[in-house]
């Protein structure tokens, strides 16, 4: 975790602008993810002629690479400082675009082209984990650890914004100039972000001996488990709400997803100080309660308006879960280990979203689509009970390393 810069207290618009000036680098990294997201599956399957398995694998490789590299991103951010990690991650985003470009240029050699696409996706996954983790820690270093919840919230907002913008823009660029044009746009976005990041003032890396990964995991895993359980609700809505609407014979699944996203972003914008005012665990428990009600409404919905209200509540409830628990998880370790703690904590969400789809698909094929929303509500209820137990647990003293004093 970087050492915060000592300067007058920030608040209001000035604070938000300072945070946005850093998390915009995470926006750039997620824009490079969103731009090819709606293009590559069809390109691999329809243009290159590979099976749906390979089309899915090309997309999934990025997520696996992000999952595996995220703990390393946090540890290197603690050791080297977050700015270097952000620039490194953005370089990975640039190289992923180069991979797409060379894949397009070697389209006459399908196997080589596919390998280059896969390589680009792996590099993108590594780049995103470094840019995302680094930008959060850089933002905290700039505005101070008091505002860590707000930094995490803004990171989530720019993530959703970049993905929402990137997918339709990517389709437009692809229809305009093919895969090569899309690749050049991706490289351009990453290059501009790198050039903007390099002259920015750095923040010092924290001094002190880092804890081993096992020790960091031991401090944050309960918060990560609560996050993973709550993420199941997000996973079943994002993945299966279209099938749910089809099974009911309703229209409007896309609008339901829009409602979820609006509730998610709107809640973060409306309650920026909630975590500081009433505490991360209290906010998390309130959020779990709202998310449970929303998921239950979706599961028992007999009319489209019931499902839409449920999706809206689920989005609002899930919105602050990550920053609320993240603030507490990060503060459970010494300052020089907080980058590793944040990255390790985030892995639980990555894992949850990775396994929710297949497991929910099995449950759906056995018991029907509505049941997966009721099951997800049950998992969030377990997260609520776990967080309640964590709140009742006596606070632990977190010693700072002697060398950091």
From Swiss-Prot:
Tell me its family: Belongs to the major facilitator superfamily. YhhS family.
Q: How does it sit in the membrane?
A: Multi-pass membrane protein
Cellular component annotations (GO), alphabetically ordered: plasma membrane
Q: What is this protein called?
A: Uncharacterized MFS-type transporter YhhS
Highest taxon listed in the record's lineage: Bacteria
Instruction: Give the signal peptide as a residue range, or say none if absent.
Output: none
Q: Which GO terms describe its molecular function?
A: transmembrane transporter activity
User: Does the keyword Cell membrane belong to this entry?
Assistant: yes
Q: Where in the cell is it found?
A: Cell inner membrane
Pfam family of this protein, just one?
MFS_1
The UniProt keywords, alphabetically, are: Cell inner membrane, Cell membrane, Membrane, Transmembrane, Transmembrane helix, Transport
From the record, give the transmembrane residue ranges: 19-39, 47-67, 85-105, 107-127, 156-176, 178-198, 224-244, 252-272, 283-303, 309-329, 344-364, 366-386
NCBIfam families the record matches? PRK05122.1
């Amino acid at each position: 975790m970087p050492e915060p810069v000592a300067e007058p207290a920030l608040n209001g618009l000035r604070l938000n602008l300072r945070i946005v000036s850093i998390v915009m680098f995470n926006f750039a990294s997620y824009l490079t993810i969103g731009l090819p997201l709606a293009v590559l599956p069809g390109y691999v399957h329809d243009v290159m002629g590979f099976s749906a398995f390979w089309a899915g694998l090309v997309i999934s490789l990025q997520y696996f690479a992000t999952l595996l590299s995220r703990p390393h991103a946090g540890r290197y951010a603690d050791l080297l400082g977050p700015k270097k990690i952000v620039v490194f991650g953005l370089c990975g985003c640039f190289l992923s675009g180069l991979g797409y470009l060379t894949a397009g240029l070697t389209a006459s050699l399908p196997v080589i082209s596919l390998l280059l696409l896969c390589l680009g996706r792996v590099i993108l996954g590594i780049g995103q984990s470094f840019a995302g983790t680094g930008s959060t820690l850089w933002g905290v270093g700039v505005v101070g650890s008091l505002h860590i919840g707000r930094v995490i919230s803004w990171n989530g907002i720019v993530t959703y914004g970049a993905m929402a913008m990137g997918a339709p823009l990517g389709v437009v660029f692809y229809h305009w100039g093919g895969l090569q044009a899309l690749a050049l746009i991706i490289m351009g976005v990453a290059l501009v972000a790198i050039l903007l990041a390099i002259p920015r003032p750095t923040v010092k890396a924290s001094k002190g001996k880092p804890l081993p990964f096992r020790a960091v995991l031991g401090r944050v895993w309960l918060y990560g488990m609560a996050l993973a359980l709550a993420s199941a609700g997000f996973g079943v809505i994002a993945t299966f709400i279209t099938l749910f609407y089809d099974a009911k014979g309703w229209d409007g699944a896309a609008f339901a997803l829009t409602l979820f996203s609006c509730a998610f972003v709107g809640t973060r914008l409306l309650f920026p100080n909630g975590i500081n005012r009433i505490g991360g665990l209290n906010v998390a428990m309130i959020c779990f309660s709202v998310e449970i009600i929303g998921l239950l409404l979706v599961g028992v919905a007999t009319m489209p308006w019931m499902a839409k209200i449920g999706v809206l509540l689920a989005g609002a409830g899930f919105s602050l879960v990550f920053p609320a628990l993240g603030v507490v998880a990060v503060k459970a370790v010494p300052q020089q280990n907080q980058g590793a703690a944040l990255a390790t904590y985030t892995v639980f969400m990555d894992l949850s979203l990775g396994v929710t789809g297949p497991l929910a698909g099995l449950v759906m094929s056995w018991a029907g689509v509505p049941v997966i929303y009721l099951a997800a509500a049950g998992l969030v209820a377990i997260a609520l009970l776990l967080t309640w137990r964590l709140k009742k647990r006596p606070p632990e003293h977190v010693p700072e390393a002697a060398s950091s004093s």
